[in-house]
Amino acid sequence: MALVPYEESAAIGLQKFHKPLATFSFANHTIQIRQDWRQLGVAAVVWDAAVVLSMYLEMGAVELRGCSAVELGAGTGLVGIVAALLGAQVTITDRKVALEFLKSNVEANLPPHIQPKAVVKELTWGQNLESFSPGEFDLILGADVIYLEDTFTDLLQTLGHLCSNNSVILLACRIRYERDSNFLTMLERQFTVSKVHYDPEKDVHIYKAQKRNQREDL
């Protein structure tokens, strides 16, 4: 998630983000996520898309045991934490400035025997991708990463690098603006995309994407 500190006047209706702790129950664990809206803005609060994607993972929609997963723009790390609790080997990523905060949440919410399953690592989309092996991950996770149009090209480049032909991408988002739909159109040029879940209460969609078979494009 991008780091955008917000003025108090812009946060009307967002009181839940100002709470220092957000508590959830996933995978038979109580998870307490520390939030810090004033210092780190959107990167340091739990958005509904992260909650819905975590619920979707808990439903067993994808096999996580033995799975190599990466969370992009992790922010507070909720999705990556849940994936690790459910058996995945997870690399939880965000920009350098957010890593200390992210790591503190991951370490606070994973039991010692599960902590080796979660690695916090720096990743700025489109930069230094060589630090990750091409097609390294079985599953790529992103919650509310589609909102800054200037990042779309870098995000697509990053997805393309991290995916193999068999990798699955799960993106959870709320379609707020036309630009959000525009990203999905851009995604469809490189990936086969389908909507696999919708939470009407939180108005969050989950999209599944996989690299297009070259034969499909002939």
UniProtKB/Swiss-Prot annotation:
Enzyme class name: transferase
Transmembrane regions: none
Binding positions (S-adenosyl-L-methionine): W47, G73, A74, G75, D94, W125, A143
InterPro entries per record: Methyltransf_16, SAM-dependent_MTases_sf
Keywords: Cytoplasm, Methyltransferase, S-adenosyl-L-methionine, Transferase
Top-level taxon of the source organism: Eukaryota
Subcellular location field: Cytoplasm
Principal subcellular localization: cytoplasm
EC number: 2.1.1.-
Gene Ontology terms for molecular function: ATPase binding; Hsp70 protein binding; protein-lysine N-methyltransferase activity
An annotated GO BP: protein methylation
CC terms in the record's Gene Ontology section: cytoplasm; protein-containing complex
Catalysis performed (reactions): L-lysyl-[protein] + 3 S-adenosyl-L-methionine = N(6),N(6),N(6)-trimethyl-L-lysyl-[protein] + 3 S-adenosyl-L-homocysteine + 3 H(+)
CDD domains in the record: AdoMet_MTases
Stated family: Belongs to the methyltransferase superfamily. METTL21 family.
Record function comment: Protein-lysine methyltransferase that selectively trimethylates residues in heat shock protein 70 (HSP70) family members. Contributes to the in vivo trimethylation of Lys residues in HSPA1 and HSPA8. In vitro methylates 'Lys-561' in HSPA1, 'Lys-564' in HSPA2, 'Lys-585' in HSPA5, 'Lys-563' in HSPA6 and 'Lys-561' in HSPA8.
Subunit structure: Interacts with heat shock 70 family members; at least some of these proteins are methylation substrates.
Protein name in UniProt: Protein N-lysine methyltransferase METTL21A
Species annotation: Mus musculus (Mouse)
Organism lineage: Eukaryota, Metazoa, Chordata, Craniata, Vertebrata
Gene symbol of the encoding locus: Mettl21A
